[in-house]
């Protein structure tokens, strides 16, 4: 489990064996119920208990803006900002030849279907800035270049409160090249 190291796992296992209540059974049922009830949204791939997630079903959101992310979990931090009021599309991964993940393994076909079906005017790529994220972005930009849609990517740079001494060269380069006028 993410965030649970060997020591924590040992403590949890010992607690499960020693506890005198039915709490471990309740936790196991809750985990099983969650796995049964929650599945990917048919449109964007985010988590939902219905066919379509709350974000895709929200008519107050702009249907013209589509933010493409790597994983459904990438939607959560973007939503916490309340800065984006469009819709999302999770690819379910990124192109990674070393891991034997190609374009056919991602939700690219579904993205193309959405572009044909929906009135999307702008795609915002919010993929990681590593080699695989860049390869995926470049592949999609090349694939979509004939579509009548504006393609942008989220800005990159220094984190709020972060100093220059802790930033890597790529982050500093992107911060300098993506500067804005004051």
Language-model-detected regions and their locations in the chain:
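Conserved phosphate/pyrophosphate-binding and hydrolysis machinery centered on Walker-type P-loop NTPases
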Residues: 2, 21, 34, 46, ...
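Long C-terminal interaction/binding lobes of large macromolecular proteins
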Residues: 8, 20, 85, 112-182
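Extended interfacial segments that mediate partner engagement and assembly in macromolecular machines
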Residues: 9, 58-127
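Cys/His-rich Zn2+-binding cysteine-cluster or related metal-binding knuckle/ribbon modules and their
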Residues: 10-75
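Glycine-rich, flexible loop/turn motifs
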Residues: 40, 52, 74, 91-94, ...
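Short glycine-/acidic-enriched loop or helix-start segments at secondary-structure transitions
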Residues: 53, 78, 135-136
């Amino acid at each position: 489990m993410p965030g649970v190291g060997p020591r924590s796992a040992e403590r949890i296992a010992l607690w499960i064996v020693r506890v005198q209540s039915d709490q471990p059974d309740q936790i196991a049922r809750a985990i099983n119920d969650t796995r049964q009830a929650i599945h990917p949204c048919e449109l964007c791939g985010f988590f939902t208990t219905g066919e379509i997630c709350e974000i895709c079903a929200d008519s107050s959101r702009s249907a013209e803006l589509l933010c493409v992310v790597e994983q459904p979990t990438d939607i959560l931090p973007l939503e916490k900002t309340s800065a984006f009021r469009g819709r999302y599309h999770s690819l379910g991964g990124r192109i990674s030849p070393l891991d034997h993940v190609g374009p056919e393994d991602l939700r690219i076909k579904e993205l193309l279907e959405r572009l044909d079906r929906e009135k999307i005017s702008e795609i915002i790529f919010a993929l990681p800035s590593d080699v695989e994220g860049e390869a995926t972005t470049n592949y999609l930009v090349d694939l979509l270049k004939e579509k009548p849609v504006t393609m942008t990517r989220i800005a990159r740079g220094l984190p709020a409160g972060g100093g220059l001494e802790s930033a890597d060269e790529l982050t500093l380069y992107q911060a300098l090249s993506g500067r804005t006028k004051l």
